[in-house]
């Protein structure tokens, strides 16, 4: 069984990596990009029967810094 966890900085939290990507895209001639938010995708191979609640607990304890990041789970 697989699960994907999408982690992004919360709205209002500065994203210096995203800003660096936006700037680099502009330098490459992609002038239409007004903003970039960078995040991460974590793919988990889970034992059958692992619940979404267990994956949520993983996120809360380790995979996401819930003070500044939000996350979304796909199973």
Language-model region placement:
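Long, contiguous binding/interaction regions
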Residues: 2-43, 47-50, 54-75
């Amino acid at each position: 069984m697989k699960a994907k966890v999408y982690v992004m900085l919360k709205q209002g939290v500065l994203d210096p990596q995203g800003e660096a990507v936006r700037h680099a895209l502009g330098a490459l001639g992609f002038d239409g990009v007004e903003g970039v938010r960078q995040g991460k995708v974590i793919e988990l191979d889970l034992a059958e029967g692992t619940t979404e609640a267990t994956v949520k607990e993983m996120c809360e304890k380790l995979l996401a810094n819930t003070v500044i990041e939000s996350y979304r789970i796909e199973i």
